Amino acid sequence: MSTRSVSSSSYRRMFGGPGTASRPSSTRSYVTTSTRTYSLGSALRPTTSRTLYTSSPGGVYATRSSAVRLRSGVPGVRLLQDSVDFSLADAINTEFKNTRTNEKVELQELNDRFANYIDKVRFLEQQNKILLAELEQLKGQGKSRLGHLYEEEM
């Protein structure tokens, strides 16, 4: 955690750009942690984006962010929006899309196999009905027909 003070004019605080204001400048303190920057003793008024300088072992980094302030009558600590790293979210999203695509392909293959089994069962049911009809026809003819067929075969 590091603490630093920034001196800026009220114009710069209000409009965010470099300017010459007739008002005296004021000093503002910022506390920077590993993930957030807090402004100490801030007044509650609209804020434009500002450049924040964060020091780390690799050097000094500048980031633009807009201040988010609580709307109450008491001045307090305000939080600044963090920049979001979408690379991890993109990787997870890509992995999810790949998994989802693979699952869809597997389900389509299983659905095709199931449809083939259903077609085979319907075909076998039709064959069974035909065989049952032939059996009933043969039963209805009686022994004379069966005997006649037997003799023809001999």
Swiss-Prot record:
Q: Which residues carry this modification: Phosphothreonine?
A: T20
**What positions are modified (N6-acetyllysine)?**
K120, K129, K139
Q: What is the lineage of its organism?
A: Eukaryota, Metazoa, Chordata, Craniata, Vertebrata
> Partners and quaternary state?
Homomer assembled from elementary dimers. Identified in complexes that contain VIM, EZR, AHNAK, BFSP1, BFSP2, ANK2, PLEC, PRX and spectrin. Interacts with BCAS3. Interacts with LGSN. Interacts with SYNM. Interacts (via rod region) with PLEC (via CH 1 domain). Interacts with STK33. Interacts with LARP6. Interacts with RAB8B. Interacts with TOR1A; the interaction associates TOR1A with the cytoskeleton. Interacts with TOR1AIP1. Interacts with TOR1AIP1. Interacts with DIAPH1. Interacts with EPPK1; interaction is dependent of higher-order structure of intermediate filament.
Asked whether the UniProt record includes GTP-binding among its keywords, one would answer: no
Role noted for this protein: Vimentins are class-III intermediate filaments found in various non-epithelial cells, especially mesenchymal cells. Vimentin is attached to the nucleus, endoplasmic reticulum, and mitochondria, either laterally or terminally. Plays a role in cell directional movement, orientation, cell sheet organization and Golgi complex polarization at the cell migration front. Protects SCRIB from proteasomal degradation and facilitates its localization to intermediate filaments in a cell contact-mediated manner.
Protein name as catalogued: Vimentin
Domain remark text: The central alpha-helical coiled-coil IF rod domain mediates elementary homodimerization.
Record domain IF rod: where:
103-154
In terms of InterPro entries, this protein maps to: IF_rod_dom, Intermed_filament_DNA-bd, Intermediate_filament
Q: Which SUPFAM superfamilies match?
A: Intermediate filament protein, coiled coil region
Gene name on record?
Answer: VIM
Residues bearing the modification N-acetylserine: S2
Low complexity bias locations: 1-13
For this protein, what post-translational modification is recorded in UniProt? One of the most prominent phosphoproteins in various cells of mesenchymal origin. Phosphorylation is enhanced during cell division, at which time vimentin filaments are significantly reorganized. Phosphorylation by PKN1 inhibits the formation of filaments. Filament disassembly during mitosis is promoted by phosphorylation at Ser-55 as well as by nestin. Phosphorylated at Ser-56 by CDK5 during neutrophil secretion in the cytoplasm. Phosphorylated by STK33. Phosphorylated on tyrosine residues by SRMS.
Q: Where is this region: Coil 1A?
A: 96-131
Q: Which residues carry this modification: Phosphotyrosine?
A: Y53, Y61, Y117
Q: Where in the cell is it found?
A: Cytoplasm; Cytoplasm, Cytoskeleton; Nucleus matrix; Cell membrane
Keyword NADP belongs to the record: no
Q: Which GO biological process annotations does it have? A: cellular response to lipopolysaccharide; cellular response to muramyl dipeptide; intermediate filament organization; positive regulation of epithelial cell migration
- Glycosylated where? S7, T33, S34
Q: What is the originating organism of this protein?
A: Ovis aries
Q: N6-succinyllysine (modified residue): where? A: K120, K129
Q: Where is this region: Head?
A: 2-95
